[in-house]
Each structure stands twice: as structure tokens, then as C-alpha cells.
Regions:
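ABC-family ATPase nucleotide-binding domain "signature/switch" substructure
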Residues: 10, 44-46, 51, 59-62, ...
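A position-specific signal in ABC ATPase nucleotide-binding domains
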Residues: 19-20, 27, 37, 164-167
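ABC ATPase NBD coupling module
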Residues: 33-46
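Conserved ABC ATPase "signature" region
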Residues: 73-94
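Helix-to-loop junction immediately C-terminal to a conserved catalytic motif
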Residues: 16
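Conserved ABC transporter NBD signature motif
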Residues: 24-31, 41
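Walker A (P-loop) phosphate-binding loop of ABC-type ATPase nucleotide-binding domains
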Residues: 3-6
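ABC-type ATPase nucleotide-binding domains, specifically the catalytic core motifs of the NBD
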Residues: 64-73
Length: 183
């Protein structure tokens, strides 16, 4: 947590391997992610970032990441965990509904739940979330938090909403950390 501009998103992107640290190392499970290789590290992680988008394609494609022979049962399970399954079933073509630039318009909250379902489909051991539930009402956020907390996943969350912060086992207040000025 911390005020805007303190570096929460930047730190999260360094931790998930999207940005390289200017100094120091990123260690996960006692392994330096640079030494095991970013691609190897990313196989066990998933990210839901503020700027994430849905791709032009079906909801099946969007949740499975366009995986060949996507596991439909697991897609439905991920959607249920994200409290979006019932809404998908009400869409014109259910999971075959086309979304994205030319597809069905969906709300910001629906988009976030689909993006979280996509992340869960990867079966991550670490899930990085940057304001990933900011467009959700408290009920949907609570359902998702409870559902994910039942999984064996480490969540690293950037959030402003008190209920999201309260769901964490550990909280780091970045406004309390010494910051080094850019060189």
C-alpha cells in the first residue's frame, strides 16, 4: 500500500519479471529469478495488471490464453471462482461469445473477473495483482478473495480498497520505506 507515485506498480512489475531491477535481485522460493530464467519463473506465475486487456476472440480464448485444446471444465471452474460464470451463460453465445475490440461490450467489472479467471487458468503458484479488483463491487471482490484464498497460491496485491488490504496476511506500507531518488 502507499500513495500514488510511490512505486507500488513498479515494484510489482519487478517482482513478476516484467521490469529488471536497477540493483539487487528478485528471489522467489530461494531462487534468483534471473538465474533460473525469466521464462521458467513466469511458467509458475500469473499477473493481472491495471492495463491488461481482453483479446479479440471468444471468452474461451480469453480465459485459456488461446490454448489449443483448452480444458473447458477448468475454464468454467476458473470463471465460477471469479463469479463471472452465470453472467457468461447469459451472453448471446455463452463462452463462445466474442469479446475485445470488435466483440460484445462488457463492463469494467466483468473484464476484471475474466482477466482474473485467465490468470487462474495458468495454475500459478504466485499471482500478482495490481488493482485487479478495483472495478468490482464489494460482493464480487469478497467472493473472488474467498475463492482464491482456498487455493494454494501466494498473492501479491497492490490495492487501495481497505477490504482488499484487510484480506492480506502481510501488508507492506511503501510510504514508510526509505526511497532513493532517481540518479
Amino acid at each position: 500500500v502507499g500513495p500514488s507515485g510511490v512505486g507500488k506498480t513498479t515494484l510489482l512489475k519487478v517482482m513478476c519479471g516484467l521490469l529488471s531491477p536497477t540493483s539487487g535481485d528478485v528471489i522467489a522460493d530461494n531462487l534468483d529469478i534471473q538465474k533460473i530464467g525469466i521464462n521458467n519463473f513466469r511458467h509458475g506465475t500469473a499477473c493481472v495488471l491495471q492495463e491488461d486487456r481482453l483479446f479479440s476472440g471468444s471468452l474461451i480464448d480469453n480465459i485459456s490464453g488461446f490454448e489449443d485444446n483448452a480444458d473447458m471444465d477448468f475454464i468454467v471452474e476458473c470463471a465460477r471462482r471469479c463469479n463471472i460464470h452465470d453472467e457468461i451463460m447469459k451472453m448471446p453465445m455463452g463462452y463462445e461469445t466474442i469479446v475485445g475490440e470488435l466483440g460484445l461490450g462488457i463492463s469494467g467489472g466483468q473484464k476484471q473477473r475474466i482477466l482474473i479467471a485467465r490468470a487462474l487458468y495458468r495454475k500459478p503458484s504466485i499471482l500478482f495483482m495490481d488493482e485487479a479488483t478495483s472495478h468490482l463491487d464489494l460482493k464480487n471482490e469478497s467472493v473472488i478473495n474467498q475463492s482464491i484464498s482456498g487455493l494454494s497460491i501466494t498473492r501479491i496485491i497492490v490495492a487501495h480498497r481497505p477490504s482488499t488490504i484487510a484480506s492480506a496476511d502481510r501488508i507492506i506500507d511503501m510510504s514508510q520505506l526509505p526511497m532513493q531518488a532517481p540518479a
